[in-house]
């Protein structure tokens, strides 16, 4: 349902809440979702990965393994600086890279059925050797590596996450109390690029991200730069980067 023009689905979800609002699902041929534009931003809980999504992959790969650290940081910043409520997956705050595999504690016929079911599910995936869900080592491989947060890379990730959370608490949370319904607008989309803005009584928040391989020209984003990563952008956004701006006041546009 999201493979075709994923940037359009993401932009709409950020601006309006749901990617599908009654449109026909390409996968099922049935209507999917309901209209969400009447809801305030805090009605939506967003995540870029969770236990179900990661655990159902054959090898339990986290986003950092699939997309790389640079893209993942851009997406993490988008998650934490949008007006929706963010949900972090365990270890995401320090860049945990261990997999989160599908594991169970079943016995007898049920254990056998689950093992065979997982193998059958990925039978058409060439080269995939699915770990046994009931094997103790499958569970052990899925446990967090708490030492990683104390590594130089882990410390940098934690500092990055803390900075984003502080910015959210100081600048974005105060806007949300007066938000009564969806106030988002999709400004621009292109492969790997989106720009969205949200208008509140207290100001206009704008966000643009680029995880493509090329530089993209920015639309007009009003206000002062709240956050830019890896550096400030002037008129364009390079690959694997993000900018968030805030224009204060009810008349901000």
Where is each model-derived feature located?
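Glycan-recognition and catalytic regions of carbohydrate-active enzymes
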Residues: 13-33, 88-89, 94-103, 125-205
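Short, polar loop/linker segments at the starts of domains and inter-domain junctions
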Residues: 60-67, 232-240
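Asparagine-centered strand-capping/turn motif at beta-strand->loop junctions
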Residues: 208-212
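Pocket-edge structural micro-motifs
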Residues: 48-50, 58, 148, 198, ...
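Short, well-ordered loop/turn elements at secondary-structure boundaries
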Residues: 39-43, 81-84, 189-190, 201-203, ...
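Conserved alpha/beta catalytic core and glycan-binding cleft of carbohydrate-active enzymes
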Residues: 1-124
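C-terminal beta-strand-rich structural cap/linker in extracellular carbohydrate-active enzymes
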Residues: 233-253
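Beta-strand-rich binding/interaction modules
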Residues: 214-231
């Amino acid at each position: 349902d999201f493979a075709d023009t994923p940037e359009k689905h993401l932009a709409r979800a950020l601006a309006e809440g749901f990617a599908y609002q009654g449109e026909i699902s390409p996968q099922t041929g049935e209507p999917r979702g309901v209209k969400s534009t009447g809801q305030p931003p805090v009605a939506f809980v967003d995540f870029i990965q969770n236990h179900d999504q990661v655990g159902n992959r054959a090898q339990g790969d986290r986003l950092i393994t699939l997309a790389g650290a640079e893209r993942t940081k851009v997406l993490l910043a988008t998650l934490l600086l949008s007006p929706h409520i963010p949900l972090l997956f365990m270890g995401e705050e320090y860049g945990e890279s261990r997999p989160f595999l599908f594991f169970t504690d079943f016995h007898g016929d049920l254990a056998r059925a689950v093992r065979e079911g997982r193998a059958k599910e990925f039978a058409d995936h060439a080269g995939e050797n699915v770990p046994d869900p009931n094997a103790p080592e499958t569970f052990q491989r899925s446990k967090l590596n708490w030492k990683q947060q104390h590594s130089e890379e882990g410390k940098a990730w934690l500092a990055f996450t803390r900075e984003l959370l502080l910015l959210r608490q100081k600048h974005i949370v105060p806007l949300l109390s007066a938000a009564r319904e969806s106030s988002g607008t999709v400004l621009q989309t292109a492969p790997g690029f989106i720009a969205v803005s949200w208008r509140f009584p207290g100001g206009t928040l704008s966000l643009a991200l680029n995880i493509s391989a090329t530089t993209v020209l920015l639309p007009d984003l009003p206000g002062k730069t709240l956050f830019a990563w890896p550096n400030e952008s002037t008129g364009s956004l390079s690959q694997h980067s993000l900018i968030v701006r805030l224009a204060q006041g009810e008349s901000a546009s």
